[in-house]
Amino acid sequence: MRRAWAVAAVAGAVALMSCGGSSTTSKAAWTAKHGAALAALNADLDTARATLSTLQRPDILGSCTQLRDSLLEARKGLPVPDPPADAALRTGFDAVDVGIEDCIQGARGPNIPQLEKSFRTLREADTLMEVATRTIDNWK
């Protein structure tokens, strides 16, 4: 699965480099409206990843539920007017979503293998969100 995420990230990066876009909404306007939600998502992603390491089910369930709420709020920023940034952000969001579901189900279980899978998936999601952040930073 890790290899699949890496391949998807590389393929996405290549596709992003070949795309251009014009937008009616400026980067500054989009960031002013949605930047706080994106920052909250990234912070909650870090918290969820750290909490998974503790193996404390109530804490894991709480942090992954908070991450789910942050993801729902951050998705309100889609579509991003810049096609490369939009594609990168959607890829990151999808990865976070997969990790959240495994996290919540594993914490409710308890299902240690599912929590381990969530940890790996959220680590990959963190990398994809970093790519998305850099892509947004490069938006002209």
Language model: regions and residue ranges:
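C-terminal motif of bacterial Sec signal peptides marking the signal peptidase cleavage site
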Residues: 15-18
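Bacterial signal peptide processing site
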Residues: 20-23
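Core hydrophobic alpha-helical membrane-spanning segments
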Residues: 11-13
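Bacterial N-terminal signal peptides that target proteins for export
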Residues: 1-9
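Alpha-helical segments in soluble extracytoplasmic regions
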Residues: 25-140
